[in-house]
From Swiss-Prot:
It catalyses: glycyl-tRNA(Ala) + H2O = tRNA(Ala) + glycine + H(+); a D-aminoacyl-tRNA + H2O = a tRNA + a D-alpha-amino acid + H(+). An aminoacyl-tRNA editing enzyme that deacylates mischarged D-aminoacyl-tRNAs. Also deacylates mischarged glycyl-tRNA(Ala), protecting cells against glycine mischarging by AlaRS. Acts via tRNA-based rather than protein-based catalysis; rejects L-amino acids rather than detecting D-amino acids in the active site. By recycling D-aminoacyl-tRNA to D-amino acids and free tRNA molecules, this enzyme counteracts the toxicity associated with the formation of D-aminoacyl-tRNA entities in vivo and helps enforce protein L-homochirality. Pfam families: Tyr_Deacylase. Keywords: Cytoplasm, Hydrolase, RNA-binding, tRNA-binding. Belongs to the DTD family. This is D-aminoacyl-tRNA deacylase.
Amino acid sequence: MKLVIQRTSGGKVEVEGKTVGEIGPGIMVLAGFGKEDTEQLPESKVWNTLIDKMIGLRIFEDEEGRMNRSLEDIKGDILLVSQFTLYASCKKGRRPSFTGAAAPQLASDLFDRLIADVSQKAPAKVATGQFGAMMNVDFVNWGPVTIILDSKDFV
């Protein structure tokens, strides 16, 4: 599992011209699942570690301008969007290969579980995109601050 976490002052996701998810200040999270991920991933220590990191990362500024506050501290929102392209390989040619991405059904199941588990721990609103849909994602990368978490780094 790969998570790209971006601090945002707000954002939204549209599908077919309709807003399906919208947040205020918080984090925008692109979540992708790879072939190495299995249906047992949500039961692993790594799963909970990544969720806790996502919510607990101190990437919001305190009164002194230092990144000392977490999403919990600011009661920030989360916008979760599935993104299989995080597993793109560009080693050959100019067209990315996505053979490293998890099968669509498994990825959908894992994304649904991620939404459920993040929602239980989130300090405020959790909004999502629509799995497998062509989406327009609009948000302000505040800072910018972008952090990448990869499950293989926590095994």
